[in-house]
Amino acid sequence: MNGQITGETIKSAIACKLSNSTFTALESFKLYKEMTRQNFSLPAFFIWTVLVTQTKEAKNRFRLNYSMEVRFHPNTRDPVSYEKLCSVGTELLDYLETIYVPIQEIGSDGALIEVVRPVRGKQMEFKIVEDVLQFLVDYSIRAARPLEEIPDMQTLEINDMSKEAK
């Protein structure tokens, strides 16, 4: 979709931000944007779109809220410490506060150009459950749909003569 931010573009922006980040508690890690059931390498981040809500604001304008989850699974061979997971969670609060989402728009010459839009995270939180870090963040996007063209009024001829006059 041209010029539109979607759950997939947000997921890709999160993955890009994580891949370019340096975590003090981690040496290396894998990134997965899809649900992987088996054969994945640890330590790893998994990125999911949890919930998408849409709220109408005005005529053709609305707000989309993308609730995203980033899970960090540490290496099972390493002794996992609560402090290490807290350190990663705290760094995620900084790294994912603003992501940069690339979208395609139509330029003034009619050609498609790639534009990067900053999107701020809200209601960020993390918790540690069974040695897995679960990080939740909401990204809110304002959007507009093209207005439907309403045909111009046509003239209507009115016959004002009563039935008896005919």
Walk through the language-model features, giving the residues of each.
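Short acidic low-complexity segments
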Residues: 31-42
